[in-house]
Regions:
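A short, N-terminal "cap"/entry segment at the start of jelly-roll beta-barrel domains
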Residues: 3-56, 65
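Conserved short histidine dyad/triad with adjacent acidic residue
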Residues: 45, 60-76
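Ligand-binding loop in jelly-roll beta-barrel domains
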Residues: 54, 110-133
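Exposed loop/turn and edge beta-strand positions of beta-sandwich/beta-sheet ligand-binding modules
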Residues: 58, 77-78, 110
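Short, conserved beta-strand element in jelly-roll/cupin
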Residues: 63-64, 75-91
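Short acidic-glycine-tyrosine-enriched beta hairpin
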Residues: 96-109
Length: 133
């Protein structure tokens, strides 16, 4: 299931304390994140909603199983950062594929094809942040 489909199914903003406005100043722990079923691994959504500066901000992580990808390369209107914290794989953005390991960070502008695949023998964890202003 694509993350976009998952987020649409979740409905409104996600964060620990319900408010009517943008995200308050807050620190998220893993236990606060919404666990979302995903066949490629463990998908956690920490936040999906408005912030002080963004109409919509989505922040989450995905622990990809060995050999897995969350979906084929795709595009969406939001800009996105992805940060690898565990494992090894490949990130694809705008026609370029790069091998990645912990500490790698990708920025991809909106409406550019991008994706990630776990090419290793252990899980690959990455955090993603995308927003619309």
């Amino acid at each position: 299931m694509k993350r976009r489909s998952v987020l649409a199914a979740l409905g409104g903003p996600l964060f620990p304390a319900a408010t009517d406005g943008p995200l308050p100043n807050v620190t998220f722990n893993k236990a606060d994140a919404k666990r979302v079923p995903d066949p490629s691994g463990e998908l956690l959504i920490y936040f999906d909603g408005p912030t002080d500066m963004c109409k919509r901000m989505t922040a989450g992580s995905l622990r990809l199983k060995p050999g897995a990808t969350p979906h084929p390369p795709h595009e969406h209107p939001e800009e996105e950062f992805m940060v690898v914290t565990e494992g090894a794989g490949e990130m694809f953005c705008d026609g370029k594929t790069v091998k990645v390991a912990p500490g790698a960070m990708m920025y991809c502008a909106g409406r550019k094809l991008h994706g990630i695949v776990n090419t290793g023998k252990v899980p690959l964890t990455f955090y993603f942040y995308k927003w619309r202003v």
